[in-house]
């Protein structure tokens, strides 16, 4: 059974040409390809929500995974869609993420360039993920008798290419999987975050979106609101006063 979202999306901006939407976790952008999943999800997608709630027909310019919350850009007409898609190809649409990962990186910032397989074949695709450490913590959470504590990092991530599960797969490949990732993560640490800290969900958020308005060339910058889960995460990583 696919869990449905516990909250609705939010329209953060719209005009005659485009929409910036905040997508909650556990919501598809559009109907999934899998027939069984499509029946279960029904009209619980961002595209259907825009039409059912606001009578808006819009086209997503990019995507977010089902489990990832954050900012999405939609075009409302064909000329706008074409211009925004050009910006995507020219890398003028910039997407920034927050992620909680297992462990501490040796360097405070870096770039991951490991090629990743295509979603539908074994073809290796060029991938670029930039990261920098925002904060590090060590918690009294043990996943085995060898280590009484566990280390975690809060990362700022810029996505330079947009492959399937790119951030999630890149972090897993460098041995720093994202917390709450059931497909590419560490089940022991996921369980501790859920049971001990009450953080149950993928700790990945599309937090900032930058692009140029396709008809005025004005730079547009948007920040995602803080959801209840991310409020817990922020509190966890805030420096404790002594």
What role is predicted for each listed range?
Residues 1-154, 174, 225-239:
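RNA pseudouridine synthases
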Residues 43-46, 147-209, 230:
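Pseudouridine synthase
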Residues 118-120, 161, 211-216:
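Short acidic, glycine-rich loop/turn motifs
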Residues 138, 185, 215:
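Residue-level detector of flexible, active-site-proximal loop/helix-junction positions
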Residues 183, 241-242:
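Flexible, disordered linker segments and immediate boundary regions flanking tandem C2H2 zinc-finger modules
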């Amino acid at each position: 059974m696919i869990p449905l979202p516990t909250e609705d999306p939010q329209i953060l901006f719209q005009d005659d040409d485009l929409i910036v939407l905040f997508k909650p976790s556990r919501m598809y952008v559009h109907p999934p390809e899998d027939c069984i999943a499509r029946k279960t999800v029904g009209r619980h997608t961002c595209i259907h929500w825009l039409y059912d709630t606001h009578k808006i027909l819009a086209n997503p310019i990019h995507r977010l995974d089902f489990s990832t919350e954050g900012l999405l850009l939609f075009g409302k007409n064909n000329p706008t869609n074409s211009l925004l898609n050009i910006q995507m190809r020219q890398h003028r649409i910039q997407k920034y993420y927050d992620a909680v990962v297992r462990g501490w990186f040796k360097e405070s910032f870096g770039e991951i360039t490991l090629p990743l397989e295509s979603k539908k074949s074994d073809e290796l695709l060029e991938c670029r993920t930039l990261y920098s450490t925002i904060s590090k913590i060590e918690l009294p959470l043990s996943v085995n008798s060898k280590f009484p504590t566990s280390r975690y990092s809060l990362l700022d991530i810029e996505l330079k290419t947009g492959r399937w599960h790119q951030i999630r797969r890149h972090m897993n490949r460098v041995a720093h999987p994202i917390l709450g990732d059931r497909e590419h993560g560490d089940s022991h640490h996921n369980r501790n975050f859920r049971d001990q800290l009450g953080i149950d969900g993928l700790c990945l958020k599309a937090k900032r979106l930058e692009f140029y308005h396709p008809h005025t060339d004005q730079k547009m910058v948007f920040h995602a609101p803080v959801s209840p889960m991310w409020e817990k995460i922020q509190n966890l990583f805030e420096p404790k006063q002594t």
